[in-house]
């Protein structure tokens, strides 16, 4: 088994850490600015609460280390051995943990405490098991360091999960547990296979062998009473990883979570702007329809010459915080109508305005009504197009 000679060697990349830490701070500041634009105070407060938690985590939070794997892989036993304390719930059928539990430990050489999170197992065949699995995957994605526990060779789904966690830039230590139930050659063969499967990844993945709960087997030489857990190599790997890269891993995790929160905040703002914009569009649809009903005018001429359309553009631009002059608004209206005409949208809308309708008084009234409705429809098309333009 490969062992590192220097456990607490300082290999920190200070420049990289500063860049990641700075990016995380900037991202959190950006979230705060976005939240100020949200008119719904309850939503804004909730998002600010989450933002403040991330800020606190970045400054003084613990390193979050999550145990992740199948229910029978021995995650809780590993946590128990690492903490030297009995934790978790027992179950004769599937796994030992039915809920997410966390345990804090202090290592003097580290800058922060370690928060070890023991999660429910994967692959539990039930609806409740599926819900637990989703919660477990979320916990892993929000961790600084993931201990991916296996008790046998890696399967396709586990390999898929490793790929997904690596896409999120997670640091993973693969823990090959229950090594006392296999020969040394079998363990080494499994380890080599895991390394070969994961070696194509850009991120380096460590593989550590453990015995969380020793069992009497043909491969153990000691008496059952003298068997002791072997998790020392895992403990050293965790400490070395956090000592060398813990600050960068934590900052990277906060950056990832802050970006997710920022997307959530932006979606709230976009939803709010869309509702406000629709009110503006509806207002000008009624104004346009009413004016044309009283004073018939070809719809295209109305859209390109009236100040009503330009005023709608100005109001929509304010909602999306885009500064436009009246000349900009007029140029934008002309350009947009030209683009819509090329796509045949105006032609299709105006096709219903038949001159033949104006041959009698009844048809004149009907003609005015159709012009009014059509102009309102065109205003809505223009308005929705402007929303997409300003949004992007």
Language-model features and meaning:
Residues 4-121, 378, 384:
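Conserved G1/Walker A P-loop phosphate-binding module
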Residues 65-71, 269-308, 337-345:
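Transmembrane alpha-helical segments and their cytosolic interface motifs
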Residues 107-110, 134-207:
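Conserved C-terminal guanine-recognition region of P-loop GTPase G domains, centered on the G4
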Residues 122-129, 181:
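Flexible beta-alpha connector loops of hexameric P-loop NTPases
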Residues 180-250:
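Canonical P-loop GTPase G-domain recognition
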Residues 246-276, 280:
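Active-site helix-to-loop segments that bind/position phosphate- or nucleotide-bearing substrates
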Residues 318-353:
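Hydrophobic alpha-helical transmembrane segments and adjacent short intramembrane/lumenal linkers
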Residues 360-392:
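Charge-biased C-terminal accessory regions appended to nucleic-acid-, cytoskeletal NTPase
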């Amino acid at each position: 088994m490969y062992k590192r000679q220097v456990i607490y060697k300082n290999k920190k990349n200070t420049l990289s850490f500063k860049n990641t830490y700075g990016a995380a701070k900037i991202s959190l500041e950006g979230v705060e600015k976005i939240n100020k634009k949200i008119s719904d105070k309850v939503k804004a407060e909730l998002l600010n609460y989450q933002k403040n938690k991330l800020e606190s985590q970045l400054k003084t939070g613990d390193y979050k280390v999550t145990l992740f794997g199948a229910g029978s892989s021995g995650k809780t036993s590993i946590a128990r051995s690492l903490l030297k304390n009995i934790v978790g719930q027992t179950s004769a059928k599937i796994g030992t943990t039915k809920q997410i539990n966390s345990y804090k430990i202090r290592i003097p050489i580290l800058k922060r405490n370690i928060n070890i999170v023991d999660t429910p197992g994967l692959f539990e065949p039930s609806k409740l098991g599926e819900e637990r699995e989703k919660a477990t995957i979320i916990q892993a994605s929000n961790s600084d360091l993931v201990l991916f526990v296996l008790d046998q060779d890696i399967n396709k789904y586990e390999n898929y999960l490793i790929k997904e966690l690596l896409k999120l830039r997670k640091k993973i230590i693969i823990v090959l547990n229950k090594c006392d139930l296999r020969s040394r050659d079998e363990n080494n063969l499994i380890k080599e296979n895991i390394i070969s499967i994961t070696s194509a990844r850009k991120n380096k993945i460590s593989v550590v062998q453990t015995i969380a709960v020793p069992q009497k087997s043909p491969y153990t030489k000691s008496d059952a009473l003298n068997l002791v857990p072997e998790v020392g190599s895992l403990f050293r790997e965790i400490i070395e990883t956090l000592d060398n890269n813990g600050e960068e891993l934590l900052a990277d995790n906060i950056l990832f979570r802050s970006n997710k929160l920022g997307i959530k905040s932006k979606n709230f703002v976009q939803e709010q702007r869309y509702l406000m914009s629709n009110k503006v569009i509806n207002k000008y649809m009624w104004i346009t329809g009413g004016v044309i009903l009283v004073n018939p005018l070809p719809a295209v001429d109305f859209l390109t010459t009236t100040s009503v359309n330009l005023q709608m553009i100005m109001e929509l631009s304010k909602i999306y915080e885009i500064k436009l002059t009246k000349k900009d608004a007029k140029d934008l209206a002309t350009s947009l109508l030209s683009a819509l005409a090329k796509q045949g949208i105006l032609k299709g809308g105006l096709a219903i305005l038949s001159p033949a309708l104006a041959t009698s008084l009844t048809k004149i009234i009907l003609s005015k009504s159709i012009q009014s409705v059509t102009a309102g429809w065109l205003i809505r098309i223009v308005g929705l197009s402007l929303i997409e333009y300003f949004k992007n």
